[in-house]
């Protein structure tokens, strides 16, 4: 067994060297490492392999992290991510490196790693990092009770503000609009971008995810949305801006809002305020975010086992859960699209797959499902919409992909384009909720697993427990025309739930319930 482990380490070394030299042999070494790794896994010998790695590399946690991230990139086995998690919690690595690595881990989780079910460990790591950051910044301010705050001011925090086609950005802007225009709040938006990436840190994670942001918003900014002006401030959360963080805390505390409302994923900056005022944290995905906020708000709740575990943990920490029945109003397309616009046959049964991370989400497991679907009938075709840079290589993998799929590219008017489809297929992933809602609005049924954002737009009986169930449901949609028509009519019911009056009333109810929890 030791010989196998030694051989596996040598394979990994060859692969890394080939990648550094941009050698054409890199894929060969990658395949060899993957094959030998999976053999060890099947023989239940991975513990010995990782113990060997710990004994050889744990003295240099950054190099060790890099090696583990390479392993994950090659084999996509969550075990390597668990090892990084443990390393982060027990090494003496500097704080900013820890934050950077944690953000890479969370990106892997969002991209559908099974590690996403380990909510408690993620929370413990977040609290550990938050405590270190608080000690580093060292702000001494007293907590201000709600009765002494300005009841007509709200500060919203977010980690990324892009264009209106970016679903989280649109959610934030819609909420800003209704808070200002209908509830007459004074709203200030703080965009705190977690971007610890620099030349040194790039050497501790293989193929790191990079945060995208609009540089035009740096510093103070004003954006117009509908007839409202939204004022805000954007800064980069990195080692060069720790002074800005401290200054912003003092400015915002003097601004004295009724509460801080964080939207999105984990945000150390927003959590810093929990010692001075009330913080409410709300993710854009299913369940609850990673936060030490006093109030944990959710508007997507699939009630899966994972979410139930989150809620149990909130009970243990004393954090207060809050349900927000967020139903953003939908604006129909001003244009009518036809299949001929995209060279799609009118007689085909077209299944669409929509996303801005299709390069990652169309993985081997999902490709197998697509092959099975396309073999049901020659009348079935698949249309990808979004960002899929690897589509040319995807269609070269199999003739059935090259002849029976199309890539429509990124579509600004997504709600209009989805009207020409027959079915919306959601890959195993956390996101996809926006595209699913647009499909339902057009009367296009949705096929999805039951533990993701998309599931929140469907009745439980219309979701699937497994990939195999998804395949069976697609077959039923294709063959059973009566069932398809019934589900199409059911999909259109979403229009009744997406008016401005519903948005207003549900937001009013949530704000009233939130105030009751403040003190």
Locate predicted features.
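A charged, aromatic-enriched C-terminal amphipathic alpha-helix characteristic of glycosyltransferases
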Residues: 336, 342, 479-519
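Active-site-proximal region of nucleotide-activated glycan assembly enzymes
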Residues: 114-124, 276-333
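Short acidic alpha-helix that forms the nucleotide-activated donor recognition element
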Residues: 246-250, 410-422, 441
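Nucleotide-activated donor-binding/catalytic signature segment of Leloir-type glycosyltransferases, i.e.
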Residues: 392-411
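Conserved catalytic-core segment of nucleotide-activated headgroup transferases in glycan assembly
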Residues: 166-177, 304, 315-397
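N-terminal subdomain of nucleotide-sugar transferases
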Residues: 2-44, 49-56, 83-87, 91-216
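Acidic donor-binding loop of glycosyltransferase active sites
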Residues: 255-259, 419-432, 444
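Catalytic binding pocket for nucleotide-activated donors in carbohydrate/polymer assembly enzymes
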Residues: 309, 427-495
């Amino acid at each position: 067994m030791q010989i196998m482990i030694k051989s596996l380490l040598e394979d990994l070394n060859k692969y890394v060297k080939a990648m550094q030299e941009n050698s054409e042999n890199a894929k060969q070494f990658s395949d060899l490492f993957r094959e030998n790794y999976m053999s060890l896994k099947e023989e239940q010998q991975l513990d010995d392999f990782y113990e060997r790695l710990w004994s050889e590399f744990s003295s240099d946690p950054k190099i060790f992290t890099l090696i583990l991230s390479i392993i994950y990139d090659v084999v996509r086995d969550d075990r390597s991510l668990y090892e990084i998690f443990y390393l982060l919690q027990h090494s003496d690595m500097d704080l900013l490196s820890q934050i950077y690595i944690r953000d890479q881990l969370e990106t892997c989780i969002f991209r559908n790693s099974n590690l996403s079910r380990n909510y408690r460990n993620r929370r413990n790591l977040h609290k550990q990092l938050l405590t270190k950051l608080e000690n580093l910044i060292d702000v001494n301010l007293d907590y201000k009770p709600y009765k002494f705050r300005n009841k007509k001011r709200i500060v919203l925090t977010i980690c990324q503000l892009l264009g209106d086609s970016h679903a989280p950005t649109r959610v934030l802007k819609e909420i800003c609009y209704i808070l200002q225009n209908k509830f007459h709040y004074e709203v200030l938006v703080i965009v705190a971008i977690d971007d610890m990436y620099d030349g040194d840190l790039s050497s501790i994670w293989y193929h790191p995810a990079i945060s995208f942001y609009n540089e035009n918003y740096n510093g103070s900014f004003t954006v117009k949305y509908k007839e409202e002006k939204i004022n805000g401030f954007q800064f980069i959360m990195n080692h060069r801006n720790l002074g800005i963080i401290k200054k912003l805390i003092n400015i915002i505390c003097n601004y004295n809002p009724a509460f801080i409302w964080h939207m999105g994923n984990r945000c150390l900056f927003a959590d810093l305020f929990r010692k001075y005022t009330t913080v409410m944290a709300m993710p854009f995905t299913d369940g609850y975010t990673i936060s030490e906020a006093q109030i944990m708000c959710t508007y997507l709740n699939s009630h899966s086992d994972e979410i139930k575990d989150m809620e149990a943990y909130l009970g243990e920490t004393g954090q207060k859960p809050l349900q927000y029945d967020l139903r953003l109003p939908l604006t129909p397309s001003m244009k009518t699209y036809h299949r001929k616009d995209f060279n799609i046959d009118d007689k085909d049964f077209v299944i669409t797959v929509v996303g801005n991370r299709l390069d990652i989400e169309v993985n081997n497991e999902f490709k197998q499902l697509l092959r099975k679907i396309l073999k049901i009938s020659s009348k079935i075709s698949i249309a990808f919409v979004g960002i899929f840079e690897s589509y040319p290589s995807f269609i070269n993998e199999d003739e059935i992909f090259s002849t029976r799929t199309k890539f429509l590219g990124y579509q600004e008017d997504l709600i209009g384009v989805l009207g020409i489809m027959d079915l919306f297929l959601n890959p195993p992933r956390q996101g996809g909720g926006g595209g699913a809602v647009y499909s339902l609005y057009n009367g296009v049924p949705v096929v999805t697993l039951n533990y993701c954002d998309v599931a929140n737009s469907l009745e439980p009986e219309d979701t699937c427990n497994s990939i195999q169930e998804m395949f069976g449901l697609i077959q039923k949609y294709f063959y059973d025309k009566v069932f398809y028509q019934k589900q199409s009519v059911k999909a259109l019911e979403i229009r009744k739930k997406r008016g401005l009056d519903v948005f207003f009333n549900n937001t009013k109810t949530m704000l009233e319930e939130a105030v009751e929890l403040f003190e």
